[in-house]
Amino acid sequence: MSRVATTAALNLAKSLRDAGIRDEAVLQAVANTPRELFLDAALGHKAYENTALPIGMGQTISQPYIVARMTELLLEHKPKKVLEIGTGSGYQAAILAQLSPELCTVERIKSLQIQARQRLKRLDLHNISFKYGDGWKGWPNKGPFDAIMVTAAAATVPEALLGQLVDNGVLIIPVGDTSQQLLKVVRHGEQFSSEVVEIVRFVPLVNGELA
């Protein structure tokens, strides 16, 4: 990163700490990650603002606070193998890949997946597996997973994702239509407990693939 970007990323991490993010590893990952890399050049000047921004195809790069909060919730379970549903710009994947030994990420929009792969390669992150496909189905051949993060809002919690969690594994997912709740779902054998974390707003999790 340039000196200006490095300072901006550090300031963003500080603002997230002030907003309540406590995990120092998460804050360090935010400080280390050039968010402008995941945006069109025209939006580069907004890269370190704590706001969601458009990335094309009706999708967004999530607000940094939400990226950090969801990551913090996931890391409480010390996962070694993580599944991300909705690669999008690749920014959330960049944060996760710095904090877990193995990341698998699924994206249904081919053009976004191609761009994300190129960006993450530039960051020299090599512990990521990519899949172009329907996020509702997860990635059964790669599972089970210690943790799953969904970066789009589902109308209901997808059964396929629950089935791909290990025992004591955690699913972090926004659920709802116009009114959405961020849920933390934990597997206990064949049972699941669910906790509402906070109110959020995400683009919808859509079935199928889009070239």
Curated annotation (Swiss-Prot):
It is found in: Cytoplasm. Pfam families: PCMT. GO terms for molecular function: protein-L-isoaspartate (D-aspartate) O-methyltransferase activity. Its main location: cytoplasm. Keywords: Cytoplasm, Methyltransferase, S-adenosyl-L-methionine, Transferase. CDD domains: AdoMet_MTases (cd02440). One of its GO terms (cellular component) is cytoplasm. It comes from the Bacteria. This is Protein-L-isoaspartate O-methyltransferase. It comes from Shewanella woodyi (strain ATCC 51908 / MS32). The gene is pcm.
